[in-house]
Design a protein with these regions (language model features):
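Beta1/beta-strand and adjacent pyrophosphate-binding region of the FAD-binding site
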Residues: 1-11, 29
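C-terminal lid/capping helical subdomain adjacent to the catalytic/cofactor pocket in oxidative enzymes
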Residues: 3, 16, 24, 334, ...
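Short hydrophobic core segments
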Residues: 6-8, 185, 192-204, 362
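Active-site substrate-recognition segment that forms the wall
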Residues: 19-20, 48-49, 80-82, 174, ...
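Glycine-rich FAD pyrophosphate-binding loop
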Residues: 22-42
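Dinucleotide-binding Rossmann-like beta1-alpha1 core, especially the glycine-rich loop
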Residues: 46-125
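Short beta-strand to alpha-helix junction loop
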Residues: 60, 90-99, 139-157, 292-297, ...
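Helical element adjacent to the flavin cofactor pocket in flavoenzyme catalytic cores
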Residues: 138-195
Length: 394
């Protein structure tokens, strides 16, 4: 039977879109070449960060998504381990403080309740931060966390209950084009026809897009991290270092840093799961599709983490992990129909924001596919046609 929509990709973005379409009456089949949550959605922390979003449309989309998370667990009928306990960003120099002051002013103007706090307050919220390495912090009470595994699977389960079909271990081997329009896909089990095909394959989206002659400007950006054994409460307030934000918004301040850590894009983030496992990292590396942990990466991440929070030395590490984030040139996802290939819809390029932006992305995609418009804030700025998709990749 012909489907209304084929969604390619079984991460949090693909599952959110499949659910959002199915609940509004579309017949949906989701195809995943491996297992659900097998890509970046299964290799990330649980942060729903708003402080990390650039002031403007990216932040507005993040706020929209965070508000949807507040009721999403009830809607899906699952415990997503959602908590809104805030995040702190740690600053290590006066230059970072000055840069963050400017970013904070712009974020507050858009309604985000973020503020600068002194070190005494930072240490009250999270003991163990190094006074020698950290000179100040910011705090935002809206920053939250959620279990990405449980959330992705809850989206998938809810979609199936509503009638969607999910096929794992089903790679797409080709796209079916008629008169320049996309009307289906080929798999090892045969062809599937549909009015719309959604590419939500994260870092692998360009591989599928190439089957339609597209050069989608998304690149894999590897992140490495550590996982500890479960311990009693160690992290009261999730942390991220401001260097990551400064690198996104003011890279010129870091242009003279020739260290290996800078080359690997090493930053600091730390969270603790509901079961007690501590996760910390991470790197941001352009290494193609090579997705393994490396001695250099792990060494630099650990050195940086211990410098900022010496108590990490007491943790027993049980494993390391790595994942490939889908990077886009302007740090914003590509969400919308492709002008030159009717029937093809992109929802990828979220990089490290897939978990944060999944609910809003699901709604935006469903709105645009069903009615050609959406009330999700600043949706037009994520239109994939801002890039020359049929020309040379950016």
């Amino acid at each position: 039977m012909k489907q209304d929509v084929i969604v390619i990709g079984g991460g949090i973005i693909g599952c959110a879109i499949a659910y959002s379409l199915q609940k509004r009456g579309k017949r949906v089949v989701l195809l995943e070449k491996n297992n659900l949550v097998g890509g970046a959605s299964g290799s990330c922390d649980q942060g729903i960060l708003l402080q990390s979003k650039a002031p403007g449309e990216h932040l507005l989309l993040g706020i929209c998504s965070m508000k949807m998370y507040e009721t999403l667990g009830r809607e899906l009928g699952a415990d997503l381990e959602f908590q809104q306990k805030g995040y702190m960003l740690l600053m290590e120099s006066q230059a970072e403080c000055d840069a963050m002051d400017g970013i904070i002013r712009q974020q507050r103007a858009l309604g985000l309740p973020v503020e600068r706090i002194e070190m005494d307050e930072a240490l009250r919220r999270q003991p163990g931060i190094s006074r020698e390495a950290v000179v100040g912090a910011t705090f935002c009470p809206w920053d939250s966390e959620v279990n990405p595994y449980k959330t992705t699977l809850a989206y998938a389960d809810a979609a199936v209950r509503l009638g969607a079909e999910i096929r794992i271990h089903t790679p797409v081997t080709g796209l079916i084009l008629q008169g320049g329009s996309l009307c289906g896909v080929r798999t090892p089990e045969g062809e599937i026809r549909a009015d719309t095909v959604v590419l939500a394959c994260g870092a692998w989206t360009p591989e599928i897009g190439a089957m339609a002659g597209l050069n989608i400007p998304i690149r894999p950006r590897k992140g490495q991290a550590y996982i500890s054994e479960a311990v009693s409460p160690f992290i009261r307030c999730n942390l991220l270092n401001a260097r990551y934000i400064v690198a996104k918004h003011h890279p010129e301040l870091l242009s003279d840093d020739r260290s290996l850590a800078a080359k690997l894009g090493v930053g600091f983030c730390i969270t603790q799961s509901a079961k007690g496992n501590v996760m910390f990292g991470a790197s941001r590396e352009f290494a193609g599709y090579e997705n393994t942990n490396t001695p250099d990466g792990l060494r630099e991440i650990l050195s940086n983490a211990v410098r900022l929070m010496p108590g990490i030395r007491s943790l027993n590490i049980i494993r390391t992990m790595s994942g490939l984030r889908p990077y886009s040139p302007d740090s914003k996802p590509l969400i919308g129909f492709v002008r030159d290939v009717p029937g093809l819809f992109l929802a990828a390029g979220h990089e490290g924001d897939g978990v944060s932006l999944a609910p809003a992305t699901g709604k935006m995609a469903a709105d645009l596919i069903l009615q050609g418009k959406t009330d999700v804030p600043a949706a037009a700025s994520f239109n994939p046609n801002r890039f020359p998709l049929t020309g040379k990749a950016a």
